[in-house]
Amino acid sequence: MIQIRHVQPEDRIFWFGLDKHLSQKEFDNKVSSKSGYVLLADDVPVGLLRYSLFWDSIPFCNMLYIDARYQRKGYGKKLMAHWEEEMKAQGYERLLTSTQADEEAQHFYRKLGYQDCGAL
């Protein structure tokens, strides 16, 4: 069974096992602001998503990560859909994310309907 919930303090070890870019302080901020999610498969945490507000007004997915052992099973798609629904329920009409030019993730986001909007 799949469950998606907001990140909680007890997720710290799992979170930092996947996300090497977030500071401890920012993790605590994600917990308190409810701007991070954990996906569990049969009660095992397997994926995460964190976001912030770009220009203080547009939800921006900073990180989507599914444990390599669980990739290509639809978990990333489910986690993105959950985030998109939550953001739309809060009244946001536009969502953003970003990848590097050579990342395989570009194909994933395009399949979800995301469009290229620029590069530097």
Predicted feature descriptions by range:
Residues Y70, G74-H82:
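Conserved acetyl-CoA pyrophosphate-binding loop and the N-cap/start of the following alpha-helix
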Residues A105:
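Helix-turn-helix
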Residues I2, H6-M63, D67, M80, ...:
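Acetyl-CoA-dependent GNAT
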Residues L96-S98, Q115-L120:
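Conserved catalytic-core motifs of GNAT/GCN5-like acyltransferases
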Residues Y109-R110, Y114:
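Conserved active-site tyrosine of GNAT-family acetyltransferases
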Residues M87-Q100:
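Conserved GNAT acetyl-CoA-binding A-motif
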Residues L64-Q71, Q100:
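A short, internal acetyl-CoA/4′-phosphopantetheine-binding micro-motif in the GNAT/acyltransferase core
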